[in-house]
Amino acid sequence: MIDKIITNIVDQEAPDQTVAVLMSGGTDSLTVAAAAHRLNKKLNCYTFRVDGKDSDDSIYAEKACKHFGWNFKLIDVPVNNIENDFFTLIKKYECKKKTHVECTFPFLYVYPHIKEKYILTGWAADGYYGVSKRANIHFKHT
């Protein structure tokens, strides 16, 4: 049932045949990518690495894309302009919290590569399934 719900949402919200997916290789991005795949969409999956160093996310994203035959696009995020990038996020994009700046920073470099009209992202399962820092602290002794 949940599969059908997610597939229907992807079908309604991303009607084009070719879509971009922000791919981490984790449960969220794989779920939304699988839904698009079932709809026979062409997937262009974008992930990033920082300063030429692969992360677990970029490694798992590449493996998933190879396995399913999705297009894989690895974007290298430089760190040589990080101070200006952070000020851009704060001033231009009005990021207020440290986590907003940290999580948004790579997308200054990823988004210019995306040409598709529709971009699929994960569903924030961390918040729903209790794997956030707050949930881990709260349920530490249960």
Kindly label every feature range from the protein language model.
Residues M1-T142:
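ATP-dependent adenylate-handling active sites, centered on carboxylate activation for C-N bond formation
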